[in-house]
């Protein structure tokens, strides 16, 4: 086993300007390629110096104290929600899915139902960031109502530390893939080093992603980073209906055309009811 090392870098010493016009940033809050090279050089230098000094130190990922407080508060709320399921304390195999459900389809239902058979308890974190066609409240309701019969499944808001503009802004830039950031490191490190241990999650489930480059890369990164913490990443094949892979993007295109007959093939009645409320079918006809 290699020695572990805790490395702290002061970005102010790397870049004294620290503003969006500086060479350090390519966008506000995200460093440029050149900055990455500088940081890598700083890290390598520290590793070499620490090795030469022979210090035994701990290399670990840490988040800022103010965010740590917010994360702890979120996790405490999640734990309280989970305890509403009386059987949860008996479960020794816990899995999780983080999903957007924009909108909730038979494909999402299939992924959840399949995963629920592979663990005692399954946590579904619905992406809370309101950057989708359907607001969080509607998406959360779709998932809640569409999985009500699955007794070992608990539906939860994702908070600001799972697939959010704070942890993985590129997820919400899919319409401009050439501009999207594929940097999911922060998101996955928070999950593997804070969220999963706190909630005793040992498996994370994802659906195969044949279309979306951002999500596909996210799944690949997940297998590497979560694997380092002995968290199994299980990829489940996508559901097909009439030889068509069920995906939310297609449903949204059907909604633009008000093709309700086609939509009915791919979404549960619980989702259909919410869609009709949202799009006010009576007025559109």
PLM features per residue range, with description:
Residues 1-22, 38-42, 46-50, 158, ...:
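Extracellular serine-dependent O-acyl
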Residues 25-29:
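Second-shell loop/turn segments in exported
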Residues 31-35:
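Accessory beta->alpha helical hairpin/"wing" motif in late/C-terminal subdomains of nucleic-acid enzymes
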Residues 48-285:
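Nucleotidyltransferase catalytic core that binds NTPs
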């Amino acid at each position: 086993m290699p020695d572990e090392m805790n490395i702290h870098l002061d970005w102010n010493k790397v870049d004294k300007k620290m503003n969006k016009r500086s060479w350090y940033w390519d966008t506000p809050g995200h460093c440029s390629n050149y900055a990455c090279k500088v940081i890598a050089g700083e890290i390598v230098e520290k590793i070499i110096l620490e090795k030469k000094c022979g210090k035994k130190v701990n290399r670990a990922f840490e988040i800022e104290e103010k965010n740590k407080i917010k994360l702890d508060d979120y996790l405490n709320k999640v734990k309280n929600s989970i305890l509403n399921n009386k059987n949860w304390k008996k479960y020794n195999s816990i899995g999780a899915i983080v999903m957007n459900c924009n909108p909730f389809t038979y494909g999402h239902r299939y992924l959840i139902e399949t995963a629920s058979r592979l663990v005692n308890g399954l946590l579904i974190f619905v992406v809370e960031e309101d950057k989708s066609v359907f607001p969080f409240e509607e998406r959360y309701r779709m998932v809640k109502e569409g999985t009500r019969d699955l007794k070992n499944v608990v539906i939860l808001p994702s908070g600001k530390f799972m697939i959010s503009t704070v942890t993985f802004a590129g997820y919400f830039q899919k319409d401009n893939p050439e501009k999207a950031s594929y940097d999911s490191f922060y998101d996955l490190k928070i999950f593997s080093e804070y969220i999963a241990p706190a909630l005793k999650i040992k498996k994370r489930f994802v659906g195969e992603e044949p279309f979306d480059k951002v999500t596909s890369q996210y799944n690949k990164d997940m297998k590497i980073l979560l694997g380092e913490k002995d968290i199994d990443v299980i990829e489940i094949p996508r559901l097909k209906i009439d030889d068509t892979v069920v995906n939310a993007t297609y449903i949204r295109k059907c909604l633009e055309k008000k093709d309700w007959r086609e939509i009915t093939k791919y979404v549960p009645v619980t989702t259909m009811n919410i869609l009709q409320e949202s799009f006010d079918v009576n007025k559109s006809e």
